[in-house]
Amino acid sequence: MKICLVATFPPSGRQLNEYAFHIARELQRHPHVELTILADELDDYGFATDANGESLKASEQPELPGFNVIRCWKFGSMTTPVRLLNTIRRLKPDVVWFNLVFSSFATPENPIAAFAGLSTPALSRACGFYTHITLHHVIESVDFAAAGVRWEKLFRMGTDVTTRALLKANSVSVLLPGYRKILVTKYAVQNVLLGRHGTFASTPCPPDFTKRGNPELRILAIGHWGTYKRLETLMEAFPAVLKAIPKAKLIVAGANHHTKAGYWESIREAQPAHLPIEFRGYVPEEDIPELFRTTSVLVLPYDSATGSSGPAHQACEYGVPIVGADIEDFRDMAADEDMSVRFYKVGDASDLANQLITVLRSPELQRSMGRQNFAAGLEMTIGNVVRNYLRWFELNRYKKALVSSPATKSSWLRSLFSGSNGIAQAGSLANDGNSGEKHGREQTGNSAQPIDFVDPLA
């Protein structure tokens, strides 16, 4: 199966590059998959800096070995659709897989280029290629005020049109049950699947709690900072945490959001020098495991959210307790994936401090939360996630073959009922690859409805 993965990809510093890396790495493990990554051109990233505040330079970021990467589109460019389509036509893949948020191709300050890029999946399908989108948020869940967007009504009109364009793809997967409900209800479509974000380890290793609290009890905040992911409340809360837990240390890692260059550096400059706060900046992928293994608690200090949390899933991978803002998306994520998360009132530094102190004071609570999160991570490894995508793609290849060549009907039916790639296993992108149990369910009140099949030929 030939797959083109359209995504930001390391060493790019742009949003979702890490997720695309883990998807690509897992796809490479499947010998029947021929993967080509259609990635963004490398640039100097003023918003992504190291611990010294130095910007990441394109010339200093070598390509990752072992991947077939074609850098054929540029962030913020109007030529993105043409360049992508020309490359796709030349490669003739079986599947074109887009890994997207609404700002994947341009910032809100450049809406025409953003819309041009986001129209590419519809154009890809129109050219006859099976096209799938993994959409990490839906615009209806975005707090535009927190994200710093002006002209909100006009922007919502534009993003409504953009969403309809995205839904012209053969299939779209979202990562929260509420997001699927929004798209199916508001836009009257049936090609939306519920998938899982996944944890990034193919073979998870149980947490080693002896690496934590020796000697520091580390609080980790990691992400792309400056819009709805903000550090002010955490900085206000930390002195109270330190007073109660003298061994506490705060680590702030990650880059600025690409629209907020210099944000975390300004936060760093405002902190008293005596506080045990370490600002690490952008963390290379190879340093992520040790960062999480030595973390006592992950904190999600957000003002709002736009989807499932990548850092929360990494915390599950390494068995780390989580303290997060009490946001509906996070509540849904924790309930749907059985995560252990202690919530604090959004913007309330005192409540945040109390929740962190409660976790850090109790080794038993840290172990209990860590083990529950690790168990949740075992249910949704990236290997299971990718296998379910591949089953879905194979199923749609069978459907296409049935229509184009009726002679294939009997062999397809034999495969269908053999169980190896059949409907029973391919029906939901959120299935657990280790069992027949289905976790991918749409929540409506207290009831759960299974995801319907999408007909890619409709």
Task: Mark where each language-model region is.
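Conserved donor-binding/catalytic core segment of Leloir-type glycosyltransferases
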Residues: C4-L5, K211-K229, M235-F238, I251
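Glycosyltransferase donor-sugar binding loop
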Residues: E41-Y45, K249-E265, G281
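Membrane-proximal helix-turn-helix segments that form the acceptor-binding/catalytic region
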Residues: A116-A126, E152-S171
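Donor nucleotide-sugar binding/catalytic pocket of nucleotide-sugar-dependent glycosyltransferases
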Residues: F155, T162-C205
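Nucleotide-activated donor-binding/catalytic signature segment of Leloir-type glycosyltransferases, i.e.
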Residues: W264-P289
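Acidic donor-binding loop of glycosyltransferase active sites
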Residues: F292-G307, V320
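Conserved acidic donor-binding segment of nucleotide-sugar-dependent glycosyltransferases
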Residues: V341-A349, I357-P363
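A short, well-ordered alpha-helix in the C-terminal region of glycosyltransferases
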Residues: L365-E379, R391
